[in-house]
Amino acid sequence: MRIHDLDPENRPRERFLSSGPSALSSAELLALVLRSGTRHLNIVDTCQRIIAENGLERLASMTLGELQKTPGIGQAKAMQIVAIFELNNRLHHTRNTNRRVQGAKDVFEYMSGRIPDETQEHLFVLHLNTKNQVTKCVRVTVGTLNASLIHPREVFKSAIRESAHAIILVHNHPSGDTEPSNADRQVTTLLKQASAVIQIDLLDHVIIGKTSWFSFRESNLLG
């Protein structure tokens, strides 16, 4: 069935105009953006399928090639989907500019959407000013943390150049389990000692999962 074959009151566009975007399902909202389907698939059915198979969270990180594996999604529609989520990421980043950090929860929320490939570990350094506002986010390494491979010079280089007052380390655990490993503890100890020498305070090391986080400071493990 094509969208035009639906009763007018059941069409996504008409319902959007009469009741607002909150009245539509995620598939219907996506269908409004993509607009048209194929001869054999209407766009709402196509959007329902892609969301049912992947969920919004995975959909937000899918590549053009992955999206095009869904029947009815060609290159142009795949680009539209990627563009929607990229705009959302940029809005999130804009809202978090100069965000004041008062605890690990703030760090978790700030980092939401900033990790490009959550199947790998990424180590980030957040620069803070004297008001504990984040002034910069720098990715230092990609891959499992290892104290023998991470040199304090690389971690603090940008912070020194930017005259940061303090830093916070952030890295993700792809498994979702935020419990620190022995390597995480060793890296934290190494960088805390270096921060005392460099005189740029290491305020915290936060490990983030999909829905939770672990704070070395809040767990009294920062030293």
From Swiss-Prot:
MF term (GO), any: metallopeptidase activity
Q: Give me any GO biological process, just one.
A: proteolysis
Question: CDD domains, per this entry?
Answer: MPN_DUF2466 (cd08071)
Keywords assigned:
Hydrolase, Metal-binding, Metalloprotease, Protease, Zinc
Q: Coiled coil: which residue ranges?
A: none
Source organism, top-level taxon: Bacteria
> What region holds the MPN domain?
100-222
Enumerate the PANTHER family for this protein: DNA REPAIR PROTEIN RADC, UPF0758 PROTEIN YEES-RELATED
Instruction: Report the family membership.
Output: Belongs to the UPF0758 family.
- Kindly provide the name given to this protein in its UniProt entry: UPF0758 protein Plut_0598
Question: Which species is listed as the source?
Answer: Chlorobium luteolum (strain DSM 273 / BCRC 81028 / 2530)
